[in-house]
Amino acid sequence: MASNTVYTSLIGLLVALTVRSIYRVYFHPLRKIPGPKIAAITHLYQHYYDAVKGGKYIWKLDELHRKYGPIVRFNPNEVHIQDSHYYHHIYAGGAKKQDKDPGFPAVPLFPGVTVTTIKHNHHRLRRGIIKSFFSKQYVTGLEHVIQSKVNLLASRFTEAYRHGTVLDLKYVFAALTSDLTTHYVYGTNLNHLAEPDFKNDFLAGMDSVGPWIPVLLVFGRLLKLARYLPACLVPAGEFLHLWTLSERRVGEILDSQDNGTMGDQKTLLQAMATADVSEEEKTATRLQMETLNIIAGGTETTARALAVGVFHLAHKPSLLLQLRDELRTVMPFPDSSASWTQLEQLPYLAGVVNESLRLSFGFIIRSARVYPNDPLVYEDLVIPPGTPISQSAYFVCMDPSIFPQPEDFNPDRWVQAAREGNNLHRYLIVFSKGSRHCLGINFALAEIYLAIATIARRFDLVPYQTTVEQLQMKRDLGFAAPEKGPFTVRAKVTGLAD
């Protein structure tokens, strides 16, 4: 009897899977979108390249586009478009409603966070709570804090020169960005810049979990369990230590609010805790999730852009010398400082900053948008409402029709484009675009401008056991990753500029 029940269940399952497969291929709303039938039938096709191959699905996507064209249905429910000129239609601004894809793996891990908020109106409310803290005016008011940390960083470069120390630029610049971001959010200083080897448990945690990202993308909902495991049992145990720190800081702020001892200092966390919104938007869990996410986003991406930029200046001394000549117009002496506003006006420096961002790629994982009410039209194909649609930032950053010889670090391309009135910034999409673009863009740009200007004006550097090829993307681990190991950029300070 039991065997008959099992047999009947298996037959029923087989029939159900067959019916579902037929529906997805021949009757699904996306049936007219080009792509392999196996991808239309099952997510396992995508999961194989993500989880088994280790972050290689981005290259399979590229292959599918070469075969099927610029629009591809790459899993049963989602469409990918590889057309740089169409990017702004997917990641649009204005009042047009666009939701987050509820299937995005980070949604269950970071509930209550602005960037993972699914519904358009709810996202707009949460974004509005913190938006003013990321305005250019507000960031400019904190420029003295950024410059003081950059000066401390420069003193560490001088120390490295005197002792012949090899610098891991990602960790060096992450010390700067994590200290600044944590100060911005909590009003406290983790003081990574004072660590002898720029020790950063948070970044070490991100490096540890990196190889697991493709697997976690497949089993996204299991990520929630990681929060309840002892740090010693989790590959990124160091990451969870920051979780504990954020928990404590949020508790302190809420306690000070309750007993009236918060004081006049206004941090991002305090602004969130005192915002005129419903209490469910100010729970300890949501405040912790939101602030932790901001620190994560503000640490690695900006540090990576700085590491990429400084590496290329070290790799091609002619670029560094050209930049230094320009910097002398506003920074006549090595220890001179210039404002962010002054630095933004320097064309070659702007080109260096833009190339640093472009070739660091930002957050490259597909982050689909869903238009709940409106269809999108691409060429002669109608993408129905409710369809997750994405475009990887990597393909825009490396589009040879926009950026000729895209693998080259070429600041002059931006100088020439500005001279000719060609708006290349339209395709600098490392902060995304539209109503859900990264709020931290102004803070990140201020850090990058001030840090690159200071380092380039004061120091000569050479790469150390790092090649251009090692910076090229081979795997999609959320961030661009080399074939093996974490992203690493090392250099030595060889001289002090005059």
Swiss-Prot record:
What is its membrane topology?
Single-pass membrane protein
Glycan-carrying positions: 259, 354
**One MF term in GO for this entry?**
iron ion binding
Where located? Membrane
Keyword Ribosomal protein belongs to the record:
no
* EC top class, as a word: oxidoreductase
Enzyme Commission no: 1.-.-.-
Q: Where does it sit, as one GO cellular component term?
A: membrane
> Which InterPro entries does its entry note?
Cyt_P450, Cyt_P450_CS, Cyt_P450_E_grp-I, Cyt_P450_sf, Cytochrome_P450_monoxygenase
For the null mutant, the annotation states:
Abolishes the ability to produce G aflatoxins but not B aflatoxins.
Q: Which UniProt keywords apply?
A: Glycoprotein, Heme, Iron, Membrane, Metal-binding, Monooxygenase, Oxidoreductase, Transmembrane, Transmembrane helix
Q: Which residues bind heme?
A: 438
What cofactor does its activity depend on? heme
Cystine connections: none
Q: Give the transmembrane ranges.
A: 5-27
Lineage, top-rank taxon, reads Eukaryota
**Function per UniProt:** Cytochrome P450 monooxygenase; part of the gene cluster that mediates the biosynthesis of aflatoxins, a group of polyketide-derived furanocoumarins, and part of the most toxic and carcinogenic compounds among the known mycotoxins. The four major aflatoxins produced by A.parasiticus are aflatoxin B1 (AFB1), aflatoxin B2 (AFB2), aflatoxin G1 (AFG1) and aflatoxin G2 (AFG2). Within the aflatoxin pathway, the cytochrome P450 monooxygenase aflU is involved in the last steps in which OMST is converted to aflatoxins B1 and G1, and DHOMST to aflatoxins B2 and G2.
Task: Give the similarity note.
Answer: Belongs to the cytochrome P450 family.
Q: What is this protein called?
A: Cytochrome P450 monooxygenase aflU
Organism per entry: Aspergillus parasiticus (strain ATCC 56775 / NRRL 5862 / SRRC 143 / SU-1)
The gene it comes from is aflU
